[in-house]
């Protein structure tokens, strides 16, 4: 164990500060009850930073993140920023530079449907049975979103636009290794998603993933075309454990997996580099419509802490305890408004309190 874990806390906009307060409760328990040497420092980001510093990602925030072992992020892009254009740019001008600066190439999006919340899924109960637990691993810094050339032109009065899907072998290699390494901590299954019957980039993707798999003979590898994969997830999500995807395909399929859980407010995410430095955040947005009402679900932010403990601190046992605390309160029937099927639900701070109590008591 390290002598000190430095965490940069970036609450951000919208419901970010509200749910981050509940994450602090968990961090304080880790310090005071589990004796973890955690040090937190808070920094501005997003619309809040634009209001105060004129930019979405101030230099002091970036420096604070550089001097940390991990970043715990709330949300960005609140309507409070000066203009609608600035609000739309807040997420792009904060998260994207952070991902680029720290080379956060691996995006982890868990999509777990708890047996206690099966009624929330849009899928039939006979399809989802007792829930599912999928981890989408998306390559985050390559592919068609960053490929050059890209643009929009006009020739002979005909307008056209173009993008370039490009992948280098090292980009595929490192995301594949990450997927197989994580498979060994789960159920030893990886399903790689591509379109290798059409795309050259996908042919290379499949070749390299297949080659990397030889280093992990105990992990079962399968391949699916993206169109078939989207159908299979709806037909039988429980057949999957880890889905390995390119940037574009992962963007689409991770949202599909999130939607079939029926509760985006429950889902955390992580973006990692090769040294397991990570940015951890809820998968949902800043939800400005419920900002300040104390009704946001803090579970995604709390589970983001769990992912931070699991991947950047490498403390699986303690991460499991945080996850179990969430399951415990769900089994007892505690709900926030977004996952409640009646008018009786806990406020944001109340849900944070019951999860914190469950973590302390070991329930």
UniProtKB/Swiss-Prot annotation:
Keywords: Amino-acid biosynthesis, Branched-chain amino acid biosynthesis, Cytoplasm, Leucine biosynthesis, Magnesium, Manganese, Metal-binding, NAD, Oxidoreductase, Plasmid. It catalyses: (2R,3S)-3-isopropylmalate + NAD(+) = 4-methyl-2-oxopentanoate + CO2 + NADH. Gene3D superfamilies: Isopropylmalate Dehydrogenase (3.40.718.10). The record marks 145, 195 as: Important for catalysis. Pathway: Amino-acid biosynthesis; L-leucine biosynthesis; L-leucine from 3-methyl-2-oxobutanoate: step 3/4. It holds the Pfam family Iso_dh. One of its GO terms (cellular component) is cytosol. Homodimer. This is 3-isopropylmalate dehydrogenase. It comes from Buchnera aphidicola subsp. Uroleucon solidaginis. The gene is leuB.
